[in-house]
């Protein structure tokens, strides 16, 4: 299944505290992806807006949450909600011929939604693991 990837989106310290409700399931999904030999990638959001208080590059808030099982060094950053706007991530997809994605993380109403929409629009097969996503209240 090397043409498939598990994509873990924005499970960072500045994300909603609701991530704690899904972190065990996300880690189970990571274990499953390892067993199936899927690529496992992590997407981090960087907020470059002036005066921002969250997801500032180089801060604790921008770091992946400590409970997250990080099993690869395939960590990509984005500055917009759609993960495909990360040039490094899209280059990785193309380099490895990835065409199918399993998506987990946050925020369901923003980055998950935007990424899945744009992946589908780009012709990729997308699966959202519904027990592995969260949103703000």
Label every PLM stretch briefly.
Residues 19-33, 37-45:
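A short alpha/beta connector and helix-capping loop motif
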């Amino acid at each position: 299944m090397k043409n498939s990837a598990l994509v873990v989106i924005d499970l960072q310290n500045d994300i909603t505290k609701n991530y704690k409700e899904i972190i065990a399931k996300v880690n189970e999904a990571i274990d499953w992806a390892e067993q199936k030999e899927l690529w496992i990638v992590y997407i981090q959001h960087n907020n470059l807006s002036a005066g921002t208080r969250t997801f500032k590059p180089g801060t604790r808030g921008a770091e992946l949450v400590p409970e997250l099982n990080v099993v690869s060094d395939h960590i990509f950053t984005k500055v917009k909600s759609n993960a495909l706007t990360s040039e490094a991530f899209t280059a990785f997809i193309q380099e490895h011929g990835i065409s199918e994605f399993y998506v987990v993380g946050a925020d369901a109403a923003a980055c998950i939604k935007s990424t899945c929409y744009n992946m589908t629009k780009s012709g990729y097969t997308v699966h959202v693991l519904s027990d592995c996503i969260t949103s703000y209240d």
